């Protein structure tokens, strides 16, 4: 297991996806992207999983981003091939994306990133695709692609302004600078900042609070907030009402009040 670059573990309804390449500051190469995507699909299909948490091994970084050496090798290999423009364009949208961010963002389960040290490039894109971000004190986050000659993709220029507003998102993306955890918390990029030794415990604590809720309610709350934010208020209210009506028809919607009256923890069935 020590040789695996991405680790996967399910415990207490939480799926842990861990970047395990500390010697390279968890730089994400193509094989790792493939593994992360596969684990995301596994978690999404597992009825015993309600929350997915991403973290990085090693004390120095959640992830410094994509593996630049790996990218250079891919570029060199591509240059040796005389592909047509159509083939080149099709390859950009292959089954294995450049980052796992689009797959993470598409998950119905609640997702969380526990970031520490460097969280840059692909590392930041992964965390932006999550619902919750908790940072360790001293963490440094940024979008560095512009300094490598290209721009952030996989939602980097789209999710960031939706989280923190256009002016600050422009500053972060255009400068390529790194921002410390305290500043990221101030501007709303991360939900909490905790001491590094407490990072995993903080994630478990928040996940535990979420797990007290009914699984389908969690899912539809997430859907209502994300999809509703792209609608007018009137449309969003109608959408919220439709989802609420669906939730009220579930077994869990009957179990919750019953457990409250009987003064016991609810026994959620997820249906």
Where are these regions (language model features)?
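Conserved CoA-thioester-binding segment of acyl-CoA-metabolizing enzymes
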Residues: 1-55, 72-73
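Terminal low-complexity tails and localization/encapsulation signals of metabolic enzymes
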Residues: 3, 258-271
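Terminal peptide-recognition signature
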Residues: 17, 21, 35-36, 54, ...
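Structural motif
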Residues: 28, 91, 114-115
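Hydrophobic alpha-helical membrane-association signature
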Residues: 32-35, 96, 199, 240
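Glycine- (often His-adjacent) and acidic-residue-rich active-site loop
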Residues: 56-103, 149, 232
């Amino acid at each position: 297991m020590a040789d695996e670059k991405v680790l996967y573990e399910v415990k207490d309804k939480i799926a842990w996806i861990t970047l395990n390449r500390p010697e390279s500051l968890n730089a994400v190469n193509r094989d790792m992207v493939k593994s992360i995507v596969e684990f995301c699909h596994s978690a999404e299909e597992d009825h015993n999983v309600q929350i997915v948490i991403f973290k990085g091994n090693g004390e120095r970084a959640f992830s410094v981003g994509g593996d630049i050496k790996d990218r250079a090798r891919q570029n060199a290999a591509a240059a040796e091939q005389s592909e047509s423009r159509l083939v080149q364009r099709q390859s950009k949208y292959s089954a294995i994306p450049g980052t796992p961010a689009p797959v993470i963002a598409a998950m119905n389960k609640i997702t969380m990133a526990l970031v520490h040290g460097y969280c840059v490039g692909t590392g930041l894109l992964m965390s932006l695709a999550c619902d919750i971000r908790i940072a360790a004190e001293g963490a440094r986050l940024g979008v560095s692609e512009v300094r490598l000659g290209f721009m952030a993709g996989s939602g980097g220029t789209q999710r960031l302004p939706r989280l923190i507003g256009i002016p600050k998102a422009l500053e972060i993306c255009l400068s390529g600078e790194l921002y410390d955890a305290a500043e990221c918390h101030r501007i709303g990029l991360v939900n909490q900042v905790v001491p590094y030794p407490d990072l995993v415990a903080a994630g478990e604590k928040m996940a535990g609070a979420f797990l007290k809720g009914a699984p389908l309610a969690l899912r539809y709350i997430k859907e209502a907030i994300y999809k509703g934010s792209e609608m007018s208020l009137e449309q969003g209210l109608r959408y919220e009402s439709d989802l609420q009506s669906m939730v009220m028809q579930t077994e869990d919607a009957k179990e919750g009040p019953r457990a409250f009256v009987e003064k016991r923890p609810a026994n959620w069935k997820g249906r």
